[in-house]
């Protein structure tokens, strides 16, 4: 038998759920003090998220998509970009956007029904929140193509959920990135659920990262609750993009600890024990435990 091709998907993890090291730290975070500003930012994101949910519950905010449990992934992605890069988020990546200069009041304006919240004071080159699923991925691919044609030292980063990786725009984006060797990083935030559809019902692929193989992209799976792994995965992908080596697909393994939005009741389709188990992998507790031990 002749084998036409084989592939492997590397999994990155440095901090286990108990906050203990399971691998050699990357040089950039060998000193635990380097993680303190990121922990503070994660704490801010969680506080903002909790307050926003409370505002919605008391009728002071419209439907809101919480990011509870995504703090390490979002902050790590935002910390890995340069100001001149372009970020194309979905509707949940507040942690990354805060790192990019988006104001908390702009988030509240948007979810309060005021589209002026999408006119960011800070990152003028970033795309606004995108509610249609995965269309932002193709927008980012277009930006990446422009950077290449202009020979600019810039990259494009886009986020979508596990459900978004089943959409045609996601596939079109990764195919374009591979065909034209674009400086694009596609971040698939796998939180286990596409609203009420579990990961197991979305695709037959063993990993979501491997979907990039078909487009000729570099693929990686990362523990999205371990901010050190997030930073290292993004470092590899952004360096490849800046060096002209093409795009990447990174699957960040995390969990949606809240409902899909405040208009959803996840208790109707999600097992209570599953959520309890997910809290044991909480990114905030994990990083706090590690930092306290240093």
Regions found by a protein language model. Name each.
Residues 128, 132-294:
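Glycine-rich ThDP/TPP pyrophosphate-binding loop and its adjacent helix/strand module
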Residues 12-19, 40-53:
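N-terminal glycine-rich anion-binding loops that anchor highly charged ligand groups
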Residues 47-50, 54-180, 198-204, 209-216:
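Cofactor-binding active-site loop characterized by glycine-rich and histidine/acidic residues
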Residues 1-27:
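Charged, compositionally biased N-terminal leader segments and the immediate start
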Residues 34-38:
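Short, contiguous, helix-prone interaction/anchoring segments in small proteins
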Residues 16, 89, 221-223:
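Structural signal for conserved beta-strand scaffold positions within catalytic alpha/beta enzyme cores
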């Amino acid at each position: 038998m002749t084998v036409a091709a084989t592939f492997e998907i590397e999994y990155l993890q440095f901090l286990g759920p108990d906050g203990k090291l399971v691998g050699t730290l990357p040089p950039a975070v060998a000193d635990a003090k380097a993680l303190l500003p990121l922990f503070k930012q994660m704490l801010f994101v969680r506080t903002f998220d909790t307050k926003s949910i409370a505002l919605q519950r008391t009728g002071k905010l419209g439907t809101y998509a919480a990011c509870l449990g995504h703090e390490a992934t979002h902050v790590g992605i935002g910390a890995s970009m340069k100001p001149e890069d372009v970020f194309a988020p979905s509707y949940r990546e507040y942690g990354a956007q805060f790192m990019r200069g988006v104001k908390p009041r702009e988030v509240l304006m948007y979810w309060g029904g005021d589209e002026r919240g999408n006119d960011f004071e800070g990152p003028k080159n970033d795309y606004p929140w995108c509610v249609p699923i995965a269309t932002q991925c193709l927008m980012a691919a277009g930006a990446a193509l422009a950077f290449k044609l202009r020979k600019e030292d810039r990259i494009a980063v886009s986020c979508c959920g596990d459900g978004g990786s089943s959409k045609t725009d996601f596939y079109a984006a990764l195919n374009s990135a591979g065909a034209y060797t674009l400086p694009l990083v596609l971040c698939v935030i796998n939180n286990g659920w596409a609203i009420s559809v579990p990961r197991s019902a979305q695709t037959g692929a063993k990993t979501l990262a491997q979907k990039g193989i078909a487009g000729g992209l570099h693929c990686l799976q990362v523990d999205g609750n371990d901010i050190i792994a997030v930073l290292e995965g993004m470092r590899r992908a952004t360096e490849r993009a800046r060096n002209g080596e093409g795009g990447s697909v990174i699957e960040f393994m995390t969990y949606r600890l809240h409902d899909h939005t405040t208009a959803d009741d996840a208790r109707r389709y999600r097992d209570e024990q599953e959520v309890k188990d997910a809290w044991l992998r909480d990114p905030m507790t994990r990083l706090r435990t590690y930092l306290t031990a240093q």
